[in-house]
């Protein structure tokens, strides 16, 4: 799950299937989001997000966050997930995630259906 936003009122979670490592030195990863996704506009503006790894225990939340829009619901509240302050960026981490990776956007590559 990818979390983003600058303040609790804006916090959102997107379920992202297309992600991975693209460089080890310097460490860099990627996510691929449809332009229509609510999180796309937040991340494009704030230039930061958190990759929150999931477990089997988070399967329901991961699925639900992938089919609901953050424009209409507070995903943290609806799924009983806890937003916690990230040490280095404003985007929140998901406390229930076993591993959270803070990310700053270096480049947005426009690629048709996804960026």
Give a label for each model feature.
Residues 1-15, 20-115:
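Active-site-proximal mixed secondary-structure blocks
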């Amino acid at each position: 799950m990818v979390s983003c936003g600058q303040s609790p009122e804006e916090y959102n979670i997107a379920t992202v299937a297309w992600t991975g490592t693209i460089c080890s030195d310097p460490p860099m990863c990627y996510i691929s989001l449809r332009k229509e996704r609510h999180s796309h506009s937040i991340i494009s503006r704030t230039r930061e997000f958190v990759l929150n790894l999931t477990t089997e225990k988070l399967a329901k939340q991961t699925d639900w966050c992938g089919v609901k829009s953050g424009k209409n619901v507070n995903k943290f509240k609806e799924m009983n997930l806890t937003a916690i302050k990230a040490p280095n960026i404003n985007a929140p981490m998901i406390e229930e995630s076993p591993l959270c990776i803070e990310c700053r956007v270096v480049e947005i590559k426009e690629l048709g259906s996804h960026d």
